[in-house]
Amino acid sequence: MQLSEWSVLLLLLKLASYIAIAGLAGTLLMRFMCGNSNVAGHQVISFYQFLKRWQITCVVTGSIAALLQVPIEAGAMAESGFMGMFDPFMLEIVWQSVIGDQATFRIPALIIALISACMWNVKSDDNVAGYKNGAVILIMLGFIAYSFTFTGHSANENGLVKSILTFHLI
């Protein structure tokens, strides 16, 4: 089997998406674990600022990967070079496939997660607001993880199998 440029691009895109989602899950886990720490205030704020930057970086990377997935898939199907990414017929085919369903499910969840990560006030003493903000990101992470069940081996499985896979991904 010969790897084309499109195959390499799609592999890199999936790798970026996986790393971004894993990074978002990791930063969220660290955020919740540090919520009850006994560390001095300024050190916690510095660490939270670090986590916030990484959350935003992960969500932006995931968003870019999700936005590029459809045109790159269309270009790979068109096999007509760079302009194949903008072929209306191929774009329509990809948007109407499970790849389009995955993108339409994942992109809004990533946008909401980005807004929530940007709105996280790390200097606030209001723990309830911080937990609500983290809960929104966690719910969006669940939606993003569920979007992975639209394609691949689990695409034809029932809801229970998809739920188990989503739980496993998180």
Features from the language model and the residues they span:
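Polytopic transmembrane helical bundles with strong interfacial aromatic enrichment
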Residues: 1-170
